[in-house]
């Protein structure tokens, strides 16, 4: 972030249920995050920002812009998933998974297994970094601490994700975008080119770029370089 802060005013937020934010017991929906993003921009930033998203959070920005056409100046999405992955809706099976994860004992146990230190390390090394040795003990501790803050209440967000409550179709919103949408994908990720092309085919103004030797973790230095060019 220090590289970006030299050239831009940067706001970074932990969304509700994530990181060091509060993790209340509720159903986390896509619309909840759309509204949180909209309110943050109106109440804190006070002007149209360039928004940078990672992974699934592209849906919050795209849908927020769709609901408020003058909200954003541009969207840069880093390693977004395929658009059709957002088309899922809660069904009987996913609702059962959500209910199980919210149970006091069983749900907490399943969450603690998922967020065990060894599983966090494995995920970071295999998915978020192209070179496993870049995963430091300090980084691992930060992820572990954040996932277990609030007596493992992060399980409520995980339950909503597994229940597909955080999903919402974005194809129509991408098609209607009139602001710049930049898609940045890691070349090492499966189907990266196909995913980026799917956004470009939906809206001809979408611009795509690729970063080599990177996993899912955002690369601020590379992003700054791409912005400059």
Regions found by a protein language model. Name each.
Residues 66, 76-106:
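Flexible "cap/lid" loop of the alpha/beta hydrolase fold
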Residues 12-52, 56:
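Active-site loop/oxyanion-hole signature of alpha/beta-hydrolase fold enzymes
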Residues 1-9:
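Short amphipathic alpha-helix adjacent to the substrate-entry channel of hydrolases
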Residues 178, 182-214:
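Conserved loop-alpha-helix segment in the C-terminal half of the alpha/beta-hydrolase fold
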Residues 214-223:
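Catalytic histidine-centered segment of alpha/beta-hydrolase-like enzymes
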Residues 86-89, 112-175:
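Conserved alpha/beta-hydrolase catalytic His-Asp/Glu region
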Residues 224-229:
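Conserved small/polar residues in nucleotide/adenosyl-binding loops
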Residues 58-69, 75:
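Short glycine-enriched nucleophile-adjacent loop
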């Amino acid at each position: 972030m220090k590289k970006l802060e030299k050239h831009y005013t940067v706001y970074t937020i932990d969304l509700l249920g994530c990181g060091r934010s509060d993790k209340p017991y509720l159903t986390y929906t896509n619309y909840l995050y759309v509204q949180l993003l909209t309110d943050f921009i109106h109440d804190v930033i006070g002007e149209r920002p360039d928004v940078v998203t990672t992974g699934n959070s592209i849906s919050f920005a795209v849908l927020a812009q769709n609901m408020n056409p003058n909200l954003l100046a541009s969207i840069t999405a880093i390693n977004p998933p395929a658009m059709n992955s957002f088309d899922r809706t809660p069904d009987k099976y996913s609702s059962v998974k959500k209910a199980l994860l919210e149970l006091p004992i069983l749900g907490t146990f399943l969450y603690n297994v998922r967020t065990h230190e060894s599983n966090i390390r494995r995920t970071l090394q295999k998915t978020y970094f192209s070179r496993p040795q870049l995963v430091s003990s300090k980084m691992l501790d930060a992820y572990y601490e954040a996932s277990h803050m609030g007596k493992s209440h992060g399980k409520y967000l995980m339950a909503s994700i597994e229940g597909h409550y955080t999903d919402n179709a974005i194809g129509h919103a991408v098609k209607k975008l009139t602001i710049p949408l930049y898609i940045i994908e890691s070349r090492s990720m499966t189907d990266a080119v196909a995913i980026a092309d799917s956004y470009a085919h939906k809206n001809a103004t979408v611009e795509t770029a690729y970063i080599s030797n990177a996993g899912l973790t955002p690369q601020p230095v590379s992003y700054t370089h791409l912005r400059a060019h």
